[in-house]
Swiss-Prot record:
The gene is MBNL2. It comes from the Eukaryota. The keyword Calcium does not apply. InterPro entries: Znf-CCCH_Muscleblind-like, Znf_CCCH. Mediates pre-mRNA alternative splicing regulation. Acts either as activator or repressor of splicing on specific pre-mRNA targets. Inhibits cardiac troponin-T (TNNT2) pre-mRNA exon inclusion but induces insulin receptor (IR) pre-mRNA exon inclusion in muscle. Antagonizes the alternative splicing activity pattern of CELF proteins. RNA-binding protein that binds to 5'ACACCC-3' core sequence, termed zipcode, within the 3'UTR of ITGA3. Binds to CUG triplet repeat expansion in myotonic dystrophy muscle cells by sequestering the target RNAs. This is Muscleblind-like protein 2. Gene3D superfamilies: 3.30.1370.210. Its main location: nucleus. Belongs to the muscleblind family. It holds the Pfam family zf-CCCH. GO terms for cellular component: cytoplasm; nucleoplasm.
Length: 373
């Protein structure tokens, strides 16, 4: 059966903060200039916030005394940006939920969500045979939107590198400190004023970047602390300031969604049962000053690796004891250290079993210096 995930209605993106000065009756700005809402008495205000009328945004509200706010132009622009951002988040959540349902019910056919460009399918790569443990891969889950995925590679065992298309163009769109210049204003025939046009009307043409016909916004002016006598950046009007703040809020939410999508993509890249917690390493007792025996069987590898690979890597790990200063009596080693130096154990025991000995028999007339670790 097919999975149909219905979008969840959310009215948070329609919520606006009410101007506190307006509630006290001391706000000197008009409804079109203030960046906060000035609701009439018919609107319901809860905890200093008011909900905007969705029908008013569409231009179809016919209520005489609407209990929702009919926002002015600059606040309507901010709400439209929030609405598009909320729609993207809903579709992203629906896609990730459908992906998780596919893992829970393997026989369920999964239909990709439209309007999203998806990354390429994960294919084979010859680099896996040389480095099967860790391979860099950019999370490219088929149903997760590529606009919210980070470009930083994620280390996933046994995964080939996958590139996400369109990430460079997305980074340019996420610039929140630039505004497009009104082309009609540049021609001198823009009928809208500076406070009504949704594009920038810079007073100085030197501010305009000719490569993309944009101007850089003075962020200090938006924060109310620009003290330059002649600023080289653009000082936007109130409605464009609201647009920039909404774009910054959208970029922050997109970054949070990107982290969540990357984490979900990393988890879903592993097959079920491949990730297990590492067991605690067994503590080996020390005796007579010797260090612990290093046993390769204590090492823990992931169950996804084959046993042949384990044997190849474990073959190069030496086993046995590491000696330091004082040898143990239980160690099967043919070396003993006396006050005269290092001598052959079999020579000391007067046992001759082979013609050539690798150790020099020390006589009483030769004194060798004792080496320390």
């Amino acid at each position: 059966m097919a999975l149909n995930v219905a979008p969840v209605r959310d009215t948070k993106w329609l919520t606006l903060e009410v101007c506190r000065q307006f509630q006290r009756g001391t706000c000197s700005r008009s409804d079109e200039e203030c960046k906060f809402a000035h609701p009439p008495k018919s609107c319901q205000v809860e905890n200093g916030r008011v909900i905007a009328c969705f029908d008013s945004l569409k231009g179809r509200c016919s209520r005489e005394n609407c209990k929702y706010l009919h926002p002015p132009t600059h606040l309507k622009t901010q709400l439209e940006i929030n609405g598009r951002n909320n729609l993207i988040q809903q579709k992203t959540a629906a896609a990730m939920l459908a992906q998780q349902m596919q893992f829970m019910f393997p026989g369920t056919p999964l239909h990709p969500v439209p309007t999203f460009p998806v990354g390429p399918a994960i294919g084979t790569n010859t680099a896996i045979s040389f480095a099967p443990y860790l391979a860099p891969v950019t999370p490219g889950v088929g149903l997760v939107p590529t606009e919210i995925l980070p470009t930083t590679p994620v280390i996933v065992p046994g995964s080939p590198p996958v590139t996400v298309p369109g990430s460079t163009a997305t980074q340019k769109l996420l610039r929140t400190d630039k505004l497009e210049v009104c082309r009609e204003f540049q021609r001198g025939n823009c009928a809208r004023g500076e406070t009504d046009c949704r594009f920038a009307h810079p007073a100085d043409s030197t501010m305009i970047d000719t490569s993309d016909n944009t101007v850089t916004v003075c962020m200090d002016y938006i924060k109310g602390r620009c003290m330059r006598e002649k600023c080289k950046y653009f000082h936007p009007p109130a409605h464009l300031q609201a647009k920039i703040k909404a774009a910054q809020h959208q970029a922050n939410q997109a970054a949070v969604a990107a982290q969540a999508a990357a984490a979900a993509a990393t988890v879903m890249a592993f097959p079920p049962g491949a990730l297990h917690p590492l067991p605690k390493r067994q503590a080996l007792e020390k005796s007579n000053g010797t260090s612990a025996v290093f046993n390769p069987s204590v090492l823990h590898y992931q169950q996804a690796l084959t046993s042949a690979q384990l044997q190849q890597h474990a073959a190069f790990i030496p086993t046995g004891s590491v000696l330091c200063m004082t040898p143990a009596t239980s160690i099967d080693n043919s070396e003993i250290i006396s006050r005269n130096g290092m001598e052959c154990q079999e020579s000391a025991l007067r046992i001759t079993k082979h013609c050539y000995c690798t150790y020099y028999p020390v006589s009483s007339s030769i004194e060798l210096p004792q080496t320390a670790c």
